Amino acid sequence: MRNNIILGNNETGERIYLTSKNKRNTPDRLQLKKYSPKLRKRVVFTEVK
């Protein structure tokens, strides 16, 4: 079953990306490189919810 998760940036506190993941296949927190408008570069966003 896929659940919706929120991706947040620890440096700026942004929570602007929403994605889904399969909890059975990836039980630990997801980390993706996404674009941060505040920093104007790609940084690591981690799973918040």
From Swiss-Prot:
Q: Is Ribosomal protein among the key words of this record?
A: yes
Q: Which GO terms describe its cellular component?
A: cytoplasm; ribonucleoprotein complex; ribosome
Q: List the disulfide bonds.
A: none
Q: Which Pfam families does the record associate with it? A: Ribosomal_L33
* Alphabetized UniProt keyword annotations: Ribonucleoprotein, Ribosomal protein
Q: Does the keyword Metal-binding apply?
A: no
One GO MF term on file is: structural constituent of ribosome
Q: Where is the signal peptide?
A: none
According to its UniProt entry, the protein's GO biological process terms are:
translation
UniProt similarity note: Belongs to the bacterial ribosomal protein bL33 family.
Mind telling me what this protein is named? Large ribosomal subunit protein bL33A
